[in-house]
């Protein structure tokens, strides 16, 4: 091949030079782990995972990444934040190329509506939307849930739509016998009008797009990860 494009995350690029030594390599570099001022020490309200085991695990992961950077002719990453997780020696070799957003579809749509239980929700409504694959602290679920009482106090006619599942994500598992979704929702459910809050679970693509199109506010929260 003239060009091989690959992801450096789990060692996929490590041995390709052994097979095709003359080929040009373009590496998609997603994230470089840091031991300070990073995801592992960001949120002391949930956990501060700076144990020796975690630090050594991240050093070991980075060692694989570094071996792949060494054989890369070019490196790309989607955002400036991701580029900034790398040391200067590597940052100077990385180009930021955004993955793109289809703004012909992902934009407000006055004709779109979403049926949720007995409600038909559209752009005329106040809609606060949170979307994450996993509803977990790593993606700010706990912070969002804690904000709902104030949101509904100021806007009692708002709809709160939450899309995402209970499966394991990037962070630690919840306490045994519960989910992150249940744990944090239980902390606020007696303080709010729960008829305004809808957990939609994992939805198909059409419903996801419609939710984006009718949202007044789309909330995205995350650890620095």
What is each residue range found by the language model?
Residues 67-70, 185, 204-215:
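Short acidic alpha-helix that forms the nucleotide-activated donor recognition element
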Residues 88, 101-119, 210:
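Acidic anion/phosphate-binding donor-loop and adjacent secondary structure
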Residues 81, 100:
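Carbohydrate-associated surface elements
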Residues 73, 210-225:
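Acidic donor-binding loop of glycosyltransferase active sites
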Residues 164, 168, 172-206:
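Nucleotide-activated donor-binding/catalytic signature segment of Leloir-type glycosyltransferases, i.e.
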Residues 23-63, 104, 108-109, 166-178:
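Acceptor-binding helix/loop patch of EC 2.4 sugar-transfer enzymes
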Residues 2-10, 24-26, 217-220:
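Short N-terminal targeting/anchoring amphipathic segment
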Residues 117-139, 145-150, 160-161:
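Conserved donor-binding/catalytic core segment of Leloir-type glycosyltransferases
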